[in-house]
């Protein structure tokens, strides 16, 4: 993983050649990830200068060569519209240089919505190798209403929209290993939520004697309970919801599936994912 350190393009690295070797020995490829989660990062200025873009790219490719990685994944999120031209130019330059070293370039992107159309995904698709659509955060911490993190219709929309701009065999669908427990206080308009992993959600539902029912329209179990002052709801992510999402991904013949994030999953989910990968390969 790589992170921006300063405005000159210097990045910090957590890359490990030992980790890459372990992955390769297990028959896995490794794509080094660079993100923009540093609060000081601003693509409208950080990527506006050729010298800064060049410095970032040089470091990424040097690290990739040193560790023996197979590709680079760009996870720049919440981009401003004014910064998109600079972001696109960064991707063009990175992809050109990476391909010269036989490296794959993938980018992460939110589900296409009216308010993110300025991302110009069609233009990105002209040069990157893969696009990973993050089919989660349908409802998030700041949402005005409680709801699923990743309902089946939301995943279907993500797949349909992405395959309009990029061939299916270059699209990877990201699905969540997490959910949220939503609290709606009676008599109050504000709602709150807390992130839970798969086991955490199951345990919370059991401990609070929540009633769990399957919602076929959402492809999820929904757990609810009411107390004297509030309603608590969890749109569960479990083996059943994962399987419904994997069916969509498989049916669309996508390149693969990604997950966010490790440590939130139930152990049984991996057998489902492995079954999908083997069937789709």
What does each of the following model-derived ranges do?
Residues 46-65, 113-122, 237-250:
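Short, acidic/polar
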